[in-house]
Design a protein with these regions (language model features):
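A short, structured surface patch at a secondary-structure boundary
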Residues: 74-126
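Bacterial N-terminal signal peptides that target proteins for export
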Residues: 1-10
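C-terminal motif of bacterial Sec signal peptides marking the signal peptidase cleavage site
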Residues: 17-21
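Extracytoplasmic low-complexity, Pro/Thr/Ser/Ala/Gly-rich segments
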Residues: 30-83, 90-96, 339-350
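Alpha-helical, coiled-coil/dimerization segments enriched in small aliphatic residues
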Residues: 228-262
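Extracytoplasmic substrate-binding proteins
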Residues: 56, 148, 155-224, 324-350
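Structured C-terminal subdomain patch of bacterial secreted/periplasmic proteins
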Residues: 274-350
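Bacterial signal peptide processing site
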Residues: 23-26
């Protein structure tokens, strides 16, 4: 049930959204130059202006209280030594059920910090819980914010959304957007360089990955393999293959060119279209039922990758399940395990 304060926030956002739409404005929160200018706080880093898909956001001064919503945005400030006052509760890959992923717990311990307030986003963003943390800025560079979400959150604090499309922000841009918003753009660039170096070393450790084509399968159930879903080139999981030296097959890149969707589906009757795929990965289960279903089905069993066994399904109940969707703190934690599993699949490709 909505409280009066939450209803007021939503009403204010709706009114603002309506005025913006009628006026034909772009939703900008300020007019400062994109490079920012020396601020009154003397840091020389503020105000900061961040452009994104839902408008332009101005952070006027150094934020003392940083909140994050949706997946992994908290990892950028944490990696840079800033502890958020609130962040989204982990709803995937959380092995101990405390709502915090292990690499986040590790970083909080390194910073000698308590766990921030956890926002339960089971039914969407908890606007009132976010407001209760009294943030100076809200980070959402990797998110699925709607325009209404954005307008409502903007009544609480300046909001930094995704640069182009919902749930499609590459890990480098997650860092760039979020670090700029908290005045740590240079530190963010250094973090990117450090992670790129780590990824390069890992890729060199598994040379059998180089040049292999890979597809990330999704939305496939062990009870029904009649439809094969896959992430397009707009999704970070597919993009990460190229970081590891792999290639995107034409069966994935071709259909991706004519859509902005991050997931597409094909009938298993067209399974031969995917015979240019060397390695298939995806989300599995701890029982192995999905892999068994793919092998037993008269259509999917014809797929070359299924025949030779060059498939790796991420275990859904463990933190490793998140490895394919790279984030600043998860990369050092699970990268080697993920690359090793992909390399074992690559060894089966002749």
């Amino acid at each position: 049930m909505r409280t009066p304060r939450l209803r007021a926030l939503a009403l204010a956002a709706a009114l603002l959204f309506g005025l913006t739409a009628c006026g034909g404005q772009d939703g900008d929160q300020g007019k400062q130059d994109d490079s920012g200018a020396a601020g009154a706080d003397g840091s020389g880093r503020f105000p900061v202006t961040v452009k994104h898909a839902l408008g332009t956001t101005v952070v006027p001064s150094e934020p003392k209280r940083v909140a994050t919503v949706n997946w992994a945005n908290e990892e950028v400030p944490l990696a840079l030594g800033v502890v958020p006052v609130g962040m989204a509760k982990a709803n995937f890959g959380d092995d101990d059920g405390d709502g915090v992923l292990p690499w986040t717990e590790k970083r909080l311990k390194e910073l000698d910090a308590k766990t921030p307030v956890l926002f339960d986003e089971t039914d969407g963003i908890d606007f009132e819980a976010v407001a209760d943390t009294k943030p100076d800025v809200i980070l959402a560079a990797y998110s699925g914010l709607t325009e209404q979400d954005y307008e409502t959150l903007s009544q609480i604090a300046p909001v930094v959304a995704y640069p182009e499309a919902a749930w499609a922000t590459p890990w480098r841009d997650i860092i760039r957007q979020n670090s700029k918003a908290i005045g740590l753009a240079e530190e963010g660039d250094k973090l990117i360089g450090d992670l790129e170096g780590r990824i390069s070393k890992t890729a060199a450790k598994y040379p059998q990955l180089k040049g292999k084509t890979a597809m990330f399968m999704t939305h496939v159930s062990s009870k029904d393999v009649s439809q094969v879903g896959f992430y397009t080139t707009h999704d970070t999981r597919t993009q990460f293959f190229t970081d590891l030296g792999m290639k995107i097959p034409a069966s994935v890149s071709g259909p991706s060119e004519s859509t902005k969707k991050f997931v597409l589906t094909k009938s298993a009757e067209r399974i031969d279209d995917f015979n240019d795929v060397d390695i298939i990965t995806g989300y599995g289960d701890d029982t192995g039922e999905l892999l068994g279903a793919l092998k037993d089905d008269p259509l999917t069993s014809k797929l070359a990758a299924v025949k030779r066994g060059s498939i790796y399904l991420l275990p859904g109940s463990t933190p490793l399940a998140t490895a394919a969707n790279p984030t600043p703190l998860s990369i050092p934690y699970v990268l080697d395990d993920y690359a090793k599993a992909l390399a074992e699949a690559a060894d089966k490709v002749k």
